[in-house]
């Protein structure tokens, strides 16, 4: 009887932990997707980097993307 109760509790704990982890991971923004300037929401090992856009010398706004942490893009 004790073995059945212990097995049931262990199974319940395992299912609960898997569910919590899935909820936490599902809430992040994937690589290459648009993010906001608050630098939050990108999946692990990603950061929200923002770049200002210019057209004919006039600033046209800012675009932010989730990219790998430490990666810098430049115009050649």
UniProtKB/Swiss-Prot annotation:
Identify a single GO molecular function assigned to this protein: toxin activity
Name the domain of life.
Answer: Eukaryota
Signal sequence, renumbered to the chain: 1-22
One GO cellular component term: extracellular region
Question: Which keywords has UniProt assigned to this entry?
Answer: Disulfide bond, Secreted, Signal, Toxin
Cell compartment(s), UniProt = Secreted
Q: Does the keyword Cell inner membrane apply?
A: no
Q: Tissue range of expression?
A: Expressed by the venom gland.
Can you summarize the PTM annotation of this record?
Contains 4 disulfide bonds.
Q: Please report the name of this protein according to its UniProt entry.
A: U7-lycotoxin-Ls1c
Originating species:
Lycosa singoriensis
């Amino acid at each position: 009887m004790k073995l059945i109760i212990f097995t049931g509790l262990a199974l319940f704990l395992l299912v609960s932990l898997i569910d919590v982890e899935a909820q936490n991971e599902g809430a992040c923004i994937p690589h290459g997707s648009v993010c906001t300037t608050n630098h939050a929401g990108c999946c692990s090992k990603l950061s929200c980097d923002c770049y200002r856009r210019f057209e004919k010398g006039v600033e046209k706004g800012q675009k932010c993307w989730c990219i790998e942490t430490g990666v810098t893009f430049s115009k050649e």
